[in-house]
Amino acid sequence: MRNGLPEFILSYINNRKQAKLDAFDKEAEKKRATLSGEALSVAELELAKARREIEQKHEVRNWLTDAASRAGQISLVTHALKFTHSDAKGSSVFNAETVEDATTLSTATLAQPAIDAVGNAAALDVAKLLQTEHDGDSLVAALQRGDNRALEALAENPEQLAQWLTGFQQVFTNRQPSSHKLAKQIYFPLANGEYHLLSPLYSSSLAHALHQRISAVRFGDEAKAIRQAQRTNQWHDQLSISYPNLAVQNMGGTKPQNISALNSSRSGRSYLLSSAPPQWNSIEKPPQQHESIFRPRGEVDYHTRATLAQMQRFLLSVKDVENNRDIRQQRLHYLDQLIDQLFFYVASVQNLPVGWSAESELKRAQQLWLDPYRAETDTVFRREREAGDWQQAVAYEFGRWLNRRLKHENLIFGEVERREWSTAALFKRRMREMESALKEELA
């Protein structure tokens, strides 16, 4: 055993305890503020008791005993079923075997595949304890090779150690494999009319390796230094790597932990590489000569013209039909297309040479949006950008633009519709994602 695992376990449990106590103390203060007199005295006794219970629960041996008892609620896997469908109840698979000289990219080509954990989301704290690396080792790796010294150093007696080992080793138990009606299934034909029924599983380990590689290229310190050198026309001794036309698949919605532990660590984000054939794209020119990209026959008009025409035709076709769920969904579909086309254009403009907006006629909010890297050298610009007020102005301009572009003698759009466009969920989400990525780069 490498040095430090017992200390890591102690630190892990203590950090969880402190987080629980901090949250408890914060809520307790709120409760005290609403009480006085006898009611406050009674509440103080109850609060003191509840706080002691948290401390007792997080006493190291108590916590490890509880964690060992909950370990059976999770499984360590490389291929997880719930990526296929969050309600699927079948088996996930652990297969970390590697293949040398492979001709295709797969989990087997990973030298050290990340091990995922699936099962009861309430027990993922146990998975994190087992999986977290400390000084090049982890508790799960130690247990796999039969090295029990980390737990032995913390156990009160051999009986308690045996109880912990029995509990934690449940994560390695091979349960009876089963599929589920929500799993993907493929009929693979054989001779004589027979077939194999295959159930492909999503490789969480491969997805995590891809996420780590791409995140390092997009947000790593070295990648930031390379991009800074590019923007200032300086030499750099490393290659500039990019993955164009990336797509992001969000797994698990607002509860990524219900899919798996690694999925939760990625906030549900999985990157998809583009498999589309290359296309010739003209280099975008900075919109310097006008006050808005939302002007008539402007840049946004050009990039969204086909979708705008389709949306207007659809709205005219259902003008006399009573509003229903299908109409609302189709209208939202067109709106989402427009938003994606807008942000695709914005992303291309943001990658133009830094500072182009300083000589432009653009409204200030659009300068702040479209030329974000100017904040690296312009302090006033940076402060305005960090204030964030410009985002509301941009959303307002987008809503006004869409009202104007959909206008027709048989279609009436007003403030209600403008507000709907400006506050669209996808618009907010794309803005949030774009700003989050930029914040990492500008940090």
Curated annotation (Swiss-Prot):
UniProt keywords, alphabetically: Antiviral defense, Coiled coil
Record text on subunit structure and interactions: Interacts directly with Cys2; part of the probable Csy ribonucleoprotein complex with cys1, cys2, csy3, cas6f and crRNA.
Similarity section: Belongs to the CRISPR-associated Csy1 family.
Tree of life domain: Bacteria
Keyword Coiled coil recorded: yes
Identification of the protein by name: CRISPR-associated protein Csy1
One Pfam family per UniProt: Cas_Csy1
Any Gene Ontology biological process: defense response to virus
NCBIfam families named among the record's database cross-references: cas_Csy1 (TIGR02564)
Gene of this entry: csy1
Induction comment: Expressed in late exponential phase (other phases not tested); part of a large cas-CRISPR3 polycistronic operon.
Coiled coil segments of this chain: 15-64
Task of the protein: CRISPR (clustered regularly interspaced short palindromic repeat) is an adaptive immune system that provides protection against mobile genetic elements (viruses, transposable elements and conjugative plasmids). CRISPR clusters contain sequences complementary to antecedent mobile elements and target invading nucleic acids. CRISPR clusters are transcribed and processed into CRISPR RNA (crRNA).
Practical and industrial applications: If the spacer DNA has a perfect match in the chromosome then toxicity results. Suppression of the toxic effects occurs via mutations in the CRISPR/Cas machinery, or via target deletion, which might contribute to genome plasticity. This CRISPR/Cas system can be used to remove genomic islands, and possibly other genomic regions.
InterPro entries to which the protein is assigned, alphabetical: CRISPR-assoc_prot_Csy1
